[in-house]
């Protein structure tokens, strides 16, 4: 797919990997809808990127909020060609620590945002992309998910985070096989350690 002239929804686009991806897409001639919970940072990033970027305050794990983001992308730029799933959180906590067992609420929150939120965006963006006319190569869209090396080599205190990223890895192939019939490519990257606000906040 040609980036130039295409529209991408980037979750977590206000900072870190999401912001870097959005900047790269705009520099390559694409248009981006930044979907992030951090409204001040998201609006500032959209302002930095100029007229080919817009922002929508988004909770990716909430159906109504996610639908609003997809609609905002289509309203702003006329169509949606790609999803770059970068939004996520991390919680460093031992299964049994000095203060007792791992918080079940924390575990559920990490899974809800990282895994359920990613799937929520995939299904809604795929629906929108499915309405596109295919390009010369038969493509209607592309989806890039962000897992982590932790999905394969999780470290001490990463049970929740590794489980959430492992889930992203596991669902990629069945989703890719299903959406291939609609001309939508699906892939997942698994980065190592990067200096992002999420990591520095641990």
Map each language-model feature to its residues.
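Residue(s) in the substrate-gating loop at a strand-loop-helix junction
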Residues: 148
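Alpha-helical segment proximal to the catalytic Tyr-Lys
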Residues: 127, 177-178
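The beta1-alpha1 cofactor-binding region of Rossmann-like NAD(H)/NADP(H)-dependent oxidoreductases
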Residues: 39-40, 57-69, 104
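Canonical Rossmann dinucleotide-binding motif of NAD(H)/NADP(H)-dependent dehydrogenases/reductases
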Residues: 2-33, 175
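Active-site helix of classical SDR
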Residues: 122, 164
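Active-site loop immediately N-terminal to the catalytic Tyr-X3-Lys motif
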Residues: 96, 153-159, 181-182
